[in-house]
């Protein structure tokens, strides 16, 4: 179980960092509506620019906290970080529903939500 928990933390944290730092301005088939960048995706959902910035800061901070939890488990960061990220994924799923995206566009949020639940429950 320790190996599974480690894998979940790494995949979630590195995935979030990849999306928000490395691929923020690159198109993917999972962006809402016809958005080509993360900023455009938030605009497509009808959200102001400050929400894009705030969500980015929070998600990167939570991903870093998950990574810290690997080396400093005594800080007890894993479960609260995963719970918060899971909540953000629920909101992301709601945004995809709001703009009536095809179900496939919700897949990354659903998978990250499942992995976050795994972290919380393990």
Where are these regions (language model features)?
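Membrane-interface extramembranous regions
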Residues: 1-122
């Amino acid at each position: 179980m320790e190996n599974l928990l480690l894998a979940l933390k790494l995949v979630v944290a590195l995935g979030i960092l990849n999306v928000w730092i490395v691929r923020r301005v690159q198109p993917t088939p999972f962006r809402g509506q016809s958005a080509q960048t993360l900023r455009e995706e938030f605009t497509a959902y009808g959200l102001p620019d400050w929400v894009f910035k705030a969500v980015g800061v929070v998600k990167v901070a939570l991903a870093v906290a998950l990574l810290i939890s690997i080396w400093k488990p005594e800080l007890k960061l894993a479960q609260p970080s995963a719970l918060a990220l899971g909540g953000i994924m629920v909101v992301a799923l709601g945004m995809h529903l709001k703009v009536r995206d095809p179900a496939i566009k919700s897949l990354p949020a659903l998978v990250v939500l499942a992995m976050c639940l795994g972290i919380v429950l393990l």
